[in-house]
């Protein structure tokens, strides 16, 4: 089977919703490039899941980082999970813990409990010194805001 060019009529025939997904992806990319934090987080999710764009964990991490560094809690969580798994970034439990800690600190209710449990699960893979380092990085991140 030969692949169809994304904008071709054959692509639309193979997947009728493609033009809609492509248009949504293009609009999200434009917003993300303009600095829209929600668009950056959404684009990270799109690259992470392969929805509307080819799956690419490196690109997901790049866009999640941009949103996370602006304080977007869900992007912080997603970036932390990428560091935990080593997807698109080198596996780094210190940075995983830091981003999950930042995300958990702004969540509420059950969402906060879930994020704190995920952070604490990562802590079981770390030394006491690494946890202290991650907490210090999170504090430094807050202090720089």
Q: Where in this protein do the model-derived segments appear?
A:
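Short helix-capping/linker turns of helical repeat alpha-solenoids
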Residues: 7-8, 29, 33-36, 49-51, ...
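Helix-turn-helix repeat elements of alpha-solenoid scaffolds
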Residues: 16-22, 56-57
């Amino acid at each position: 089977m030969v692949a169809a060019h994304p904008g071709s009529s054959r692509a639309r025939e193979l997947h009728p919703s493609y033009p809609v997904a492509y248009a949504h992806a293009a609009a999200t990319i434009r917003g993300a490039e303009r600095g829209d934090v929600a668009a950056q987080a959404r684009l990270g999710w799109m690259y992470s899941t392969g929805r509307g764009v080819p799956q690419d964990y490196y690109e997901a991490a790049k866009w999640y980082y941009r949103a996370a560094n602006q304080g977007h809690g869900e992007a912080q969580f997603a970036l932390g999970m990428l560091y935990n798994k080593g997807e698109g970034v080198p596996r780094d439990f210190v940075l995983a813990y830091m981003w999950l800690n930042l995300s958990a600190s702004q969540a509420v209710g059950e969402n906060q409990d879930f994020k704190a449990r995920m952070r604490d699960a990562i802590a079981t893979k770390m030394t006491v010194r690494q946890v202290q380092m991650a907490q210090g990085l999170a504090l430094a991140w807050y202090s720089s805001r």
